């Protein structure tokens, strides 16, 4: 059972960006909006991100970086932080998953897992 002080939930909404994609050159662009919800009892700061982006051919790109879109937000208990970003993959379908490294106000570092989510061109999946 996880410690209720460090409870971060992540939800994702994705969108295919047809106008930024070029299927003839294997370029498929997607936007995603992520909400990081602090359901724990302590304030937590989002320090960094770690992504695994997998295309439909099974090729994996690993991305690490500080914060999200140039920010390292502090999220109070019961509050959330929402941001939008994007990814480009070389196939019509792919997935993203990963984690955020968090720093709680009591000094503990912990990971908030981001469950796999799908990037898919509309109509690419049956």
From Swiss-Prot:
ApaG domain location: 2-126
Pfam families recorded: DUF525 (PF04379)
InterPro entries, sorted: ApaG_domain, ApaG_sf, Uncharacterised_ApaG
SUPFAM superfamilies for this protein: ApaG-like
Coiled coil: none
GO biological process, one term: error-free translesion synthesis
Name of the protein in its database record: Protein ApaG
Classification lineage: Bacteria, Pseudomonadati, Pseudomonadota, Gammaproteobacteria, Pseudomonadales
